[in-house]
């Protein structure tokens, strides 16, 4: 904590955001359990005098702010800022104020509150997109934040927290690039069960789009990770080749808080594959590309997403690119850090979870009488997170059982890790 007379410590179990909380009252004293059950996330924000502030998801899937008052050796919890309909992405305390980054349909919205939890103002942002930054101390009066989106390279602004005014401090400039030559929009589509899924669609502004337009769809959908608007040179290169780039914000992520994550994990994992498949169906129905012009791409958990969705819907895509993917769902937990992913996937050592994993495990669902899309399987020689055997086994079996003339390639990068 700020006065160094006490310390807060978090204890986690597996790859799970829930944690226990312990407090050390002085440098040489023992840690005292404050939250001794895995009932939510507790993340320390800052402290002042005898008050410690935390972000928590206990009883608040979208997150809320609480404080812990230390009074005569006892602990008193108080709710400071209640849960909102929008998920909290980050919280900072600067100039005796909370600066909270909320996600509203995947876009950042910045709200400022005083330390009593009273709303002060909503920041008027320079652009719609993803905001990061706001580092600083409780007594600082200024800070910096960055903004980006699918067509805007990173811009950094300096903000005065006394009046919430800000000015451009720096921006990334690319030779020959003009963001006004591109467009990006957010739409929503129904998944298999009717759930509305956000999807960002970006391309050159003057592009004439039809069923022949090249379409690349990206997804992740797992581990409470939000995939937010972000500028990428490789995405821009695709757009410059007259392609449409789409990012589906699938269940399993954190875009709408813990409930969105839980709807795409464990026995609900199939929802994620359905969400991804219905993204292509939605775009094709709007005459944005067609199965013969569509590629899907994803990395790590997204590699699982691409492989599983491609196997379940081979007629939807021309090309699939599962990168460094988790592809053997019955043995992923036997290698390196794989055991930690059981929180999202489940364990093959538990009967009902085994049956669920077997139903979608890419390695175990390749059929011999199906023509699959052209597939580029990538892995890395020193990947100690998702070991290369996932990709090697999947690619070999796909090559063996492929029933038509489309091909699968394996690309091994040397000597790299999980990237």
Question: What is each PLM-predicted segment?
Answer:
Residues 13-14, 57, 103, 148:
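Short loop/turn segments immediately following the C-termini of beta-strands
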Residues 16-22, 60-66, 106-111, 152-157:
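Structural motif
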Residues 2, 6-10, 33, 37-55, ...:
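Conserved beta-propeller blade repeats
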Residues 1-8, 12, 411-419:
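Single conserved hydrophobic/aromatic residue that forms the stacking wall/gate
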Residues 53, 62, 142-165:
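Structured, non-catalytic alpha/beta "coupling" segments that mediate domain-domain communication
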Residues 2, 25-42, 69-92, 116-133, ...:
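Multi-bladed beta-propeller domains
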Residues 247-412:
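Active-site-proximal cap/loop segments of hydrolase catalytic domains
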Residues 170-292, 299, 334, 338:
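Cap/lid segment of the alpha/beta-hydrolase catalytic domain
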